[in-house]
């Protein structure tokens, strides 16, 4: 096999695994040769109120992109995650909640979770939420976040979750775009020992005159002081106290919207990724089962926040549809002690751990302290998600956290894909550190050059997917034209991922990162355009350009070139002020790591900023700038290089 390091499947894994190499090959072959037959059979992994007779009805044709799966079937997501388990697994723990403070934890059985979801479903109905309405969630990592999600699905409402780290401005934009008239939040969140002012942020977001929110349901998490609007605000505990724990699930069409989740694009404002009910749930359920080699007795921990797609698919829906025990962690991996993540593994006897390279690199920087005094013997499978994992971090994770016992499933997928597209499978795949390896069933990746010509064999190029799969997003909320433009216009007839990849001689895929103007910071996607817009909204800034630079913990750091308006001078105070400004406009996650005060930016004669050059300057690769003859003023480049060395 190519690439220096290969870790073959270990006997103790293959002996108990759901699939072996031959099983994978046969299933994969069937999935691409006859998708209708394959997905028709796999669709039965969930329960249907009215079985489907149609399976796949999809088109990637220019101007006619349309994606439908199981389109005449009826089902309910919450019934699949709860009701169907009550007879056999009613007393099994569904959610283990581990608080920010290690002294706080809770367990909810499937029966208890079912009752809470029914109560909250009735609360939503009483507040006038109807089938098809969009409900905005801005919640901490507590079981009530999952309860609210499942309650929406029970009554046929569409949830739009906004990560609790986003600013009031970012929250308002998402509330307006989705048309939410109700927000579910908490007084405060807790993270790393510090309160997060969720209710205060909601109050501020709702001062935007374009919001149309009539009700805010508030969970009491910390008991911190919050402002109160009597006609608008409702306490969660008061509303649920009198609610009935009986609420029959709505029969939803497979193509009814399930949720909207906003993600950054390379241009303009974030786009609402729309996922529908049937195909999404089939895909989340099936990928969870096979990628994590799920067995009934497993204790599964995905460290992602519910505000990200990983939290949707692999903390809530995938695990619960499989009847698994899923851990929900409010805190951060290194608080109050460096070995917190390992402590949680031991405390709850976690068998499957799914986390992000950023967390792994942060722990790796602490060395053995990250595992001090813990055994982690319960671990069986470990996963990585959010961005490509560098081989050094992979090796450390494998050796130090998993003690060379646990295969690592390095999963590649996106908000848009609904679930994992490329990943090793335990029991099947020999591992190579840093490679996402092979495609999941029904997923047909290809590499193309910049002209869209297919590249064969071992090569590198733009990663496209040539046919649809059930978990694929259906459209951009309210803007199908943007959906086609973003994903299907670059390489017509194919879904363009926006990522580059390398394929080795064993057919393994190595994701090389974004090829568009999107950054991946700590596993979170951010469009450079979004950060640039926030910067130029500052009254003293005339122009800004943002590029990604390597960062040893976050994967990518944010490097901002900033040109001030005439008459303004750079200063330490302004530097601090600009960082604060971005934090307020978008959230702490978008704060620039470097601000480079630039007199001018390299532009073509048509006025386009040459980001390629800015990237090279930011990373110090100034001896390989390439052709700069098309620049309107080539002298700008020397000036930028000088400024950088002076700033350093």
From Swiss-Prot:
Its cofactor is Mg(2+). CoA binds at residues 191-194, 310, 334, 522, 583. Its EC number is 6.2.1.1. Keywords: Acetylation, ATP-binding, Ligase, Magnesium, Metal-binding, Nucleotide-binding. One of its GO terms (biological process) is acetyl-CoA biosynthetic process from acetate. SUPFAM superfamilies: Acetyl-CoA synthetase-like. ATP binds at residues 386-388, 410-415, 499, 514, 525. GO terms for molecular function: acetate-CoA ligase activity; AMP binding; ATP binding; metal ion binding. It is an enzyme of class 6 (ligase). Pfam families: ACAS_N, AMP-binding, AMP-binding_C. Mg(2+) binds at residues 536, 538, 541. The modification N6-acetyllysine is found at residue 608. GO terms for cellular component: cytosol. Acetylated. Deacetylation by the SIR2-homolog deacetylase activates the enzyme. CDD domains: ACS. It catalyses: acetate + ATP + CoA = acetyl-CoA + AMP + diphosphate. Belongs to the ATP-dependent AMP-binding enzyme family. Catalyzes the conversion of acetate into acetyl-CoA (AcCoA), an essential intermediate at the junction of anabolic and catabolic pathways. AcsA undergoes a two-step reaction. In the first half reaction, AcsA combines acetate with ATP to form acetyl-adenylate (AcAMP) intermediate. In the second half reaction, it can then transfer the acetyl group from AcAMP to the sulfhydryl group of CoA, forming the product AcCoA. This is Acetyl-coenzyme A synthetase. It comes from Aeromonas salmonicida (strain A449). The lineage of its organism: Bacteria, Pseudomonadati, Pseudomonadota, Gammaproteobacteria, Aeromonadales.
């Amino acid at each position: 096999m190519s690439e220096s390091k290969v870790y073959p499947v270990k006997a103790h894994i293959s002996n108990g695994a759901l699939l072996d190499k031959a099983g994978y090959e046969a299933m994969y072959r069937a999935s691409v040769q006859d998708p209708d037959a394959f997905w028709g059979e796999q669709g039965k992994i969930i329960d249907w109120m009215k079985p489907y007779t149609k399976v796949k009805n999809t088109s990637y044709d220019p101007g006619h992109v349309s994606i439908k799966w199981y389109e005449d079937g009826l089902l309910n997501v919450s019934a699949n995650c709860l009701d169907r388990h009550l007879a056999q697994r009613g007393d099994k723990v569904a959610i283990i909640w581990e608080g920010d403070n290690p002294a706080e934890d809770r367990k909810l059985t499937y029966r208890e979770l079912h009752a809470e979801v029914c109560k909250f479903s009735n609360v939503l109905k009483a507040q006038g939420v109807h089938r098809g309405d969009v409900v905005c969630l801005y919640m901490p990592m507590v079981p009530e976040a999952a309860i609210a999600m499942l309650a929406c699905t029970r009554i046929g409402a569409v949830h739009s979750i906004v990560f609790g780290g986003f600013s009031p401005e970012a929250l308002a934009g998402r509330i307006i775009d989705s048309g939410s008239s109700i927000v579910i939040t908490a007084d405060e969140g807790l993270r790393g020992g510090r309160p997060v002012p969720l209710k205060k942020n909601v109050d501020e977001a709702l001062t935007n005159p374009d919001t149309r929110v009539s009700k805010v349901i508030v969970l009491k998490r910390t008991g911190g002081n919050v402002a109160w609007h009597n006609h608008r605000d409702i306490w969660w505990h008061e509303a649920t106290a009198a609610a009935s724990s009986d609420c029959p699930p709505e029969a939803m069409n497979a193509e009814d919207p399930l949720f909207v989740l906003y993600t950054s694009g390379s241009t303009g404002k974030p786009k609402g990724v729309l996922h529908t009910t049937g195909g999404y749930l089939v895909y989340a359920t099936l990928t969870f089962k096979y990628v994590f080699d799920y067995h009934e007795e497993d204790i599964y921990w995905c460290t992602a926040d519910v505000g990200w797609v990983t939290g949707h698919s692999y903390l809530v829906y995938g695990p619960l549809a499989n009847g698994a025990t899923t851990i929900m962690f409010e805190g951060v991996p290194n608080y109050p002690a460096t070995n917190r993540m390992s402590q949680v593994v031991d405390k709850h006897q976690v068998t499957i751990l799914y986390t992000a390279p950023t967390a792994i690199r942060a722990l790796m920087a602490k060395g053995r302290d990250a595992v001090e005094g813990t055994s982690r013997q319960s671990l069986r499978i470990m996963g990585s998600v959010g961005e490509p994992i560098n081989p050094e971090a992979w090796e450390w994770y494998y050796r130090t956290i998993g003690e060379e016992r646990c295969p690592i499933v390095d999963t590649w997928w996106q908000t848009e894909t609904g679930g994992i597209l490329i990943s090793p499978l335990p029991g099947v795949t020999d591992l190579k550190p840093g490679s996402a390896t092979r495609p999941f069933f029904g997923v047909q990746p290809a590499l193309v050059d910049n002209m869209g010509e297919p590249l064969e064999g071992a090569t590198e190029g733009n990663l496209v997917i040539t046919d649809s799969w059930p978990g694929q997003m259906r459209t951009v909320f309210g803007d199908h034209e943007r959906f086609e433009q973003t994903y299907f216009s670059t390489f017509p007839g194919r879904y363009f991922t926006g990522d580059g990849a390398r394929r080795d001689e064993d057919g393994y895929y190595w994701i090389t990162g974004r090829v568009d103007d999107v950054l991946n910071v700590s596993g979170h996607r951010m469009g450079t355009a979004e950060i640039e817009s926030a910067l130029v909204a500052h009254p003293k800034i005339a122009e800004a350009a943002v590029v990604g630079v390597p960062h040893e913990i976050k994967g990518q750091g944010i490097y901002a070139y900033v040109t001030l308006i005439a008459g303004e001078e750079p200063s330490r105070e302004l530097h601090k002020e600009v960082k604060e400004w971005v934090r307020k406009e978008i959230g702490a996650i978008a704060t620039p790591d470097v601000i480079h005060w630039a007199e001018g930016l390299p532009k073509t004669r048509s006025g386009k900023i040459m980001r390629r050059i800015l990237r090279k300057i930011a990373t110090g690769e100034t001896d390989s700038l390439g052709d700069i003859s098309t620049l309107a003023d080539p002298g700008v480049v020397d000036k930028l290089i000088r400024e950088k060395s002076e700033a350093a």
